[in-house]
Amino acid sequence: MNRIGVFGATGRVGKLLVELLGSDENAKLSSVFVRKELDFSMPPGALVTNDYKTFLEGCDVVIDFSLPDATAALLETAMQGHPKPLVIGTTGLDAHHFNLIHEASRQMPVLYATNMSLGVAILNKMVHTAAKALADFDIEIVEMHHRHKKDSPSGTALTLAESCAKARGVELDEVRVSGRNGNIGERKSEEIAVMSLRGGDIAGKHTVGFYSEGEYLEFVHTATSRMTFAKGALRAAKWLAKQESGLYGISDALGI
């Protein structure tokens, strides 16, 4: 039985993880990290705390859907004598956070993914193949999320853009375009555009388009419920609990 710690249990995905663990036969919720008062009930026996060390000591595997600074503090505490397998789904991370993730992965297994769904994992492989095969096609990526999402573009959109850039042997920072306005001239052939839309309660929609003269190809993934992210994260946690120290992605956990 995997004892799961949910870090960021009051968030949208965190709440779903708590719900999911209440009925799972092979894992149980053992510890929960929160910074504010809970407005929902926890399963009997679950430890609720705002202390990083206590939280880590109360579980075997951690699933983190929180905020960048909280993720950084979690990683730092884990590296100070409290290593645990860490599944990190927090988005909006910067270079400092990624350095911490790489450093932590030397001491414990760490799985980082901007999206935990099986569909997006497949999509990522498909767009990599398409970007390489359709070398002279223009790439445009559009992501849409609910009005409350704080980071833009989405982590998933950036992951997809990075996959396309790697397929073409270029650095994303050198070719990425995140908006167009005014008399900017013609589109440069090497551009990889990443555009963001916000509105309503959309869980997540990503469109990756490859456009040429006479034809175009579009890949679309739509998440109709955030529960798909929770299920993917729990599946990843069960897999990660058996792994050695190192840095992993969701494709590793899914075996694709």
Curated annotation (Swiss-Prot):
Metabolic or biological pathway: Amino-acid biosynthesis; L-lysine biosynthesis via DAP pathway; (S)-tetrahydrodipicolinate from L-aspartate: step 4/4
MF terms in GO: 4-hydroxy-tetrahydrodipicolinate reductase; NAD binding; NADP binding; oxidoreductase activity, acting on CH or CH2 groups, NAD or NADP as acceptor
Record GO cellular component, one term: cytosol
Documented EC number(s): 1.17.1.8
SUPFAM superfamilies recorded: Glyceraldehyde-3-phosphate dehydrogenase-like, C-terminal domain, NAD(P)-binding Rossmann-fold domains
Keyword entries, A-Z: Amino-acid biosynthesis, Cytoplasm, Diaminopimelate biosynthesis, Lysine biosynthesis, NAD, NADP, Oxidoreductase
CDD domains named among the record's database cross-references: DHDPR_N
Annotated localization: Cytoplasm
Domain of life from the UniProt record: Bacteria
Keyword S-adenosyl-L-methionine: no
Keyword NADP belongs to the record: yes
Binding site for NADP(+): 36
Residues binding NAD(+), per UniProt: 8-13, 89-91, 113-116
InterPro entries: DapB_C, DapB_N, DapB_N_CS, DHDPR_bac, NAD(P)-bd_dom_sf
Pfam families: DapB_C, DapB_N
Binding-site residues for (S)-2,3,4,5-tetrahydrodipicolinate, renumbered to this chain: 146, 155-156
Biological-process GO terms, alphabetical: diaminopimelate biosynthetic process; lysine biosynthetic process via diaminopimelate
Enzymatic reactions: (S)-2,3,4,5-tetrahydrodipicolinate + NAD(+) + H2O = (2S,4S)-4-hydroxy-2,3,4,5-tetrahydrodipicolinate + NADH + H(+); (S)-2,3,4,5-tetrahydrodipicolinate + NADP(+) + H2O = (2S,4S)-4-hydroxy-2,3,4,5-tetrahydrodipicolinate + NADPH + H(+)
Top class in the EC scheme: oxidoreductase
Similarity annotation: Belongs to the DapB family.
HAMAP family: DapB
Its job: Catalyzes the conversion of 4-hydroxy-tetrahydrodipicolinate (HTPA) to tetrahydrodipicolinate.
Protein name: 4-hydroxy-tetrahydrodipicolinate reductase
The gene coding this protein: dapB
